[in-house]
Regions:
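Internal transmembrane alpha-helix with an interfacial aromatic "cap," most often the third helix
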Residues: 18-28, 53-105, 114-121, 148-151, ...
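Hydrophobic alpha-helical transmembrane segments of multi-pass membrane proteins
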Residues: 10-22, 34-58, 70-81, 111-116, ...
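Hydrophobic transmembrane alpha-helical segments in integral membrane proteins
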Residues: 1-20, 69-70, 127-138
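Non-cytosolic membrane-interface motifs at loop->transmembrane helix junctions
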Residues: 61-72, 126-137, 188-198
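C-terminal transmembrane-bundle signature of multipass membrane proteins
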Residues: 80-83, 141-221
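Membrane-interfacial loop-to-transmembrane alpha-helix junctions, especially the N-terminal start
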Residues: 29-44, 95-107, 156-169, 219-221
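Membrane-helix boundary elements
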Residues: 108-132
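A mid-sequence, solvent-exposed acidic-amphipathic segment
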Residues: 48, 123-154
Length: 221
């Protein structure tokens, strides 16, 4: 059994389902840009993994060099970051001194991911190519995870929307953790663990879209 192939197939199917579901729900007049960006994030994973499945079926390799499937993860993380930073953070954080601790505590997430990268990649005997690719993913995970954790713990002092999206932000944090875990397991050829991560990604990605939809309905009710 090719564990890597099936991991990518499961992730691709789940992400594609979430992307189609989000496309039907959110790409209509007067729908929130925030929800559309989350849908695009899931779509990036879907098409990135579809590419990897095709690559594995044709040349039986996804890791020997940089390839387009790698951009699926990067695109997904960039959309997650942009959604929270660009479309939501200004509504949540008024930059008051009283809420400073809620800006400091979320630094724990990027610090954790940076430590993982330093220990297992940068200060290891990994090839330069691996260090660079892992570094690019880590930087994007750091940016996205900071705002997901911030919006998970931040008190909703004015608009009420952030409380409705806590479920989504938790799922997004788990997804970002899975991105780093997958990077580690593939690098060390832990095929069964990579397969398990693929299953989890295939479940969590569509759940992110569902959580955003439920949060939006709860807020507007």
């Amino acid at each position: 059994m090719n564990w890597y192939l099936w991991a990518n197939i499961i992730t691709a199917v789940g992400a594609l389902g979430g992307f189609i579901y989000g496309g039907v729900l959110f790409f209509r007049p007067r729908k929130a840009v925030y929800a559309q960006m989350i849908t695009f994030a899931v779509g990036c994973m879907a098409f990135g993994r579809i590419y990897q499945v095709i690559r594995m079926l044709t040349i039986h390799d996804i890791s020997s060099q940089f390839h387009l499937g790698f951009l699926g993860v990067i695109g997904s993380l960039l959309f997650l970051f942009s959604a929270n930073y660009g479309a939501m953070d200004g509504l949540v954080d008024d930059k008051s001194k009283e809420l400073r601790k809620y800006r400091i505590i979320p630094l724990a997430a990027p610090v954790l991911f940076l430590a993982i990268y330093l220990i297992f990649f940068l200060f290891s005997d990994q090839p330069l190519r691996v260090k660079i690719m892992a570094g690019v993913i880590t930087v994007n995970v750091m940016h996205a995870s900071y705002f997901n954790l911030k919006h998970l713990i931040f008190p909703d002092v004015e608009y009420g929307v952030i409380n409705c999206l806590k479920g989504y932000n938790l799922l997004a944090l788990i997804f970002e953790l899975l991105c780093v875990a997958e990077m580690l397991t593939m690098n060390r050829d832990f095929q069964v663990l990579t397969f398990v991560i693929g299953i989890l990604m295939g479940v969590i990605l569509p759940m992110m879209v569902i959580a955003v939809n439920r949060g939006g309905k709860k807020w507007s009710a």
